[in-house]
């Protein structure tokens, strides 16, 4: 799971489980983050819901415990019936400080890095992408909090 070009960036692995759920009717197509995230799909009645964090069991097996956790959290803010259509698990890298990192490799400027968004940060992905674009195309500075070269 280590990237040989960016192996100096500290991260840890976590297993996460997500659900694909179908509601009885279409919902307003927007992403929500309330302890878990809920993101729309092409079908306005179907959403992806996640994610759990398991730091010990780094496998791709789904668990009833994680499914129950996600269903309970979803029901805490969406008071509508839903059916679980799919349940998936995967191991993902988590930037240790849970922050976005952008920039070019210090020794090879042909290698770019755009990572660390996480579920909350993904809501800001368009802004981070615009910052990275301006950095690459116009030479604009990256925000200091996410500049790869200033943080490591």
Annotate the PLM regions.
Residues 83-152:
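C-terminal catalytic lobe of FAD-dependent flavoproteins
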Residues 1-109:
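Active-site substrate-recognition segment that forms the wall
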